[in-house]
Amino acid sequence: MQFISEQRLDDGVLEREFTIGEIRGILWTPESAATPTPLILLGQIAGPNGGLRSPRLVARARHTVAEGFAATTIEFPGSGDRPGPAVTDQARTDLRKALQAGKPVTDDIVDRLILPLLDQAVPDWQATLDALLELPDIGGPVGFSGGVISIPVRLAAIDPRITSAVLFAGSYVPRSIIEQARQVTIPLHVLLQWDDEGNDRQMALDLFDAFGSKEKTLHANMGGHTGVPQFAGEEANRFFARHLK
């Protein structure tokens, strides 16, 4: 792991950009933390509006640090400047054609769109965790927040270092991931925008039902994809405060 830049922001946040092999990421920590800080992994959206420096992501990170946590994100395949697997480009084209024609989105399209991303992104997150948890100012427990929902589902199913998660229901989910969700037993707080045109609501409900967690909350709000009310974020903060502090 190598830190390649460092700056102190005006709200008491230390921002450090790092590389781990081919992985690029950013770590945000409280500038004056006296003890190791619990860590929250921030997932990203796929596509050109994602990336390490997207305004929404940076705002989430700074808000997370203001709540007393460390926050980190990595540039996963298909976000920002990092190219995704070629098969996902074709799947994205097939998805767009199906939606424009009013046809159902098949399981094959969803698998080709999501599974290749998981095969790269999940090992990248595990390598990032390996490196960050060696730092003296970072400690457990570890939470996951947001992004393409299938990524934290698989990560939580296979990596016991993830102890709680806030999930954003708003992306397509392969059937194999719904099955894998039965292995996820950590506390979960799931946000669902009820009127999100790009979200298969029933798929989101099926995924929530499949989770094996004894503590899981579905927080549904009226409105579209970008209409998440501020109080929903406040509820998510309280969730992490209960489970990570």
Predicted regions and their residues:
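Conserved alpha/beta-hydrolase "acid-adjacent" motif
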Residues: R175-S176, E197-M203
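Acidic catalytic loop of the alpha/beta-hydrolase fold
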Residues: W194-N199, T226-G227
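Catalytic histidine neighborhood in serine/cysteine hydrolases
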Residues: A204-L205, D209-G227
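Catalytic active-site module of serine/aspartate enzymes centered on a nucleophile-bearing elbow/loop
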Residues: M222-G223, V228-K245
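Serine-hydrolase catalytic machinery in alpha/beta-hydrolase-like enzymes
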Residues: I40-E134, I177
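N-terminal cap/lid segment of alpha/beta-hydrolase-fold proteins
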Residues: M1-T35
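Short beta-strand/loop motif that positions the catalytic acidic residue
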Residues: V184, V190-L192
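Primarily recognizes the serine-hydrolase "nucleophile elbow" in alpha/beta-hydrolase
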Residues: D119-Q183
